[in-house]
């Protein structure tokens, strides 16, 4: 029996756990259906050289849009990863101006002083459903059209198609994060809008076919993850609010 959505689990043995097939997000079902119909049509026409590649394409599309249940730690101190992928950049930078500038709505933006940005690169093999790193209210959702450079490049955060989110907790702590399209990704799909209240680990959007997510930590907060580390959306603790540990690791 696999994890059940909404089930409470803990480190004392409460809850049930086991492997199960992940569900397919509705955004991906239409693509999977198109590929499956094309594969079936080719098979019925005895076009095996076309049918087999289309069959593998169908499996690939369904795998890309898989949406597994995640066990999110419930602790107000924790900032959880919004994305599956690899930590490729950790830098001190000012937050995007779209998250800082007065947008005329009366909603307070982030301070424009440099903070730590953690960049998570998602390959085509990773789950591409993105989740909220903290619980709170979505204060801003800002879409910026742009280029489709390699999402692993630093300049992708300023030149690529991207979508910014600003989440604010009840105590005023704010975290910004940005979905960035990559070489293959051509569509960023949000599931939330400004004013929505979200839980930590709640699904907030997806990027199709390879991309990156940047997280802007609050001032005085440093990551608990390392360069090159693999993280899991909604489960891996990226940081603890107000904590700035120095952590080293070794590749082995």
Curated annotation (Swiss-Prot):
Is synthesized initially as an inactive proenzyme. Formation of the active enzyme involves a self-maturation process in which the active site pyruvoyl group is generated from an internal serine residue via an autocatalytic post-translational modification. Two non-identical subunits are generated from the proenzyme in this reaction, and the pyruvate is formed at the N-terminus of the alpha chain, which is derived from the carboxyl end of the proenzyme. Binds 1 pyruvoyl group covalently per subunit. Belongs to the phosphatidylserine decarboxylase family. PSD-A subfamily. The modification Pyruvic acid (Ser) is found at residue 211. Catalyzes the formation of phosphatidylethanolamine (PtdEtn) from phosphatidylserine (PtdSer). The keyword Transferase does not apply. Its cofactor is pyruvate. It is an enzyme of class 4 (lyase). It comes from the Bacteria. One of its GO terms (biological process) is phosphatidylethanolamine biosynthetic process. Its EC number is 4.1.1.65. The record marks 210-211 as: Cleavage (non-hydrolytic). The active site is at residue 211. Heterodimer of a large membrane-associated beta subunit and a small pyruvoyl-containing alpha subunit. It comes from Novosphingobium aromaticivorans (strain ATCC 700278 / DSM 12444 / CCUG 56034 / CIP 105152 / NBRC 16084 / F199). This is Phosphatidylserine decarboxylase proenzyme. GO terms for molecular function: phosphatidylserine decarboxylase activity. The gene is psd. It is a peripheral membrane protein. Keywords: Cell membrane, Decarboxylase, Lipid biosynthesis, Lipid metabolism, Lyase, Membrane, Phospholipid biosynthesis, Phospholipid metabolism, Pyruvate, Zymogen. NCBIfam families: PRK05305.1-2, PRK05305.1-3. GO terms for cellular component: plasma membrane. Pfam families: PS_Dcarbxylase. It catalyses: a 1,2-diacyl-sn-glycero-3-phospho-L-serine + H(+) = a 1,2-diacyl-sn-glycero-3-phosphoethanolamine + CO2. InterPro entries: PS_Dcarbxylase (IPR003817), PSD-A (IPR033175). It is found in: Cell membrane. Pathway: Phospholipid metabolism; phosphatidylethanolamine biosynthesis; phosphatidylethanolamine from CDP-diacylglycerol: step 2/2.
């Amino acid at each position: 029996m696999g994890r059940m959505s909404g089930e409470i689990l803990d480190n004392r043995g409460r809850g049930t756990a086991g492997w199960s097939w992940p569900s397919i997000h509705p955004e991906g079902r239409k693509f999977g259906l198109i590929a499956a119909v094309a594969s079936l049509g080719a098979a019925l026409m005895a076009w095996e050289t076309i049918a087999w590649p289309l069959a593998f394409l169908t499996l690939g599309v369904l795998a890309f849009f898989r949406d597994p249940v995640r066990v999110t730690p419930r602790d107000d101190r924790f900032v959880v990863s919004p994305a599956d992928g690899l930590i490729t950049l950790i830098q001190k930078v000012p937050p995007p101006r779209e998250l800082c500038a007065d947008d005329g709505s009366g909603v307070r933006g982030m301070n424009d002083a440099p903070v730590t940005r953690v960049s998570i690169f998602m390959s085509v093999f990773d789950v591409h459903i993105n989740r909220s790193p903290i619980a709170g209210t979505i204060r801003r959702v800002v879409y910026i059209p742009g280029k489709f450079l390699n999402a692993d490049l630093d300049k992708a955060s300023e030149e690529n198609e991207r979508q910014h989110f600003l989440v604010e907790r009840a105590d005023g702590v704010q975290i910004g994060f940005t979905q960035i399209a990559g070489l293959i990704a051509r569509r960023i799909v949000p599931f939330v809008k400004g004013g929505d209240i979200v839980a930590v680990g709640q699904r907030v959007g997806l990027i199709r076919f390879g991309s990156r997510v940047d997280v802007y930590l609050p001032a005085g907060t440093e990551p608990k993850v390392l360069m090159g580390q693999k993280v899991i959306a909604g489960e891996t603790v990226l940081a603890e609010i107000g904590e700035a540990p120095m952590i080293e690791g070794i590749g082995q």
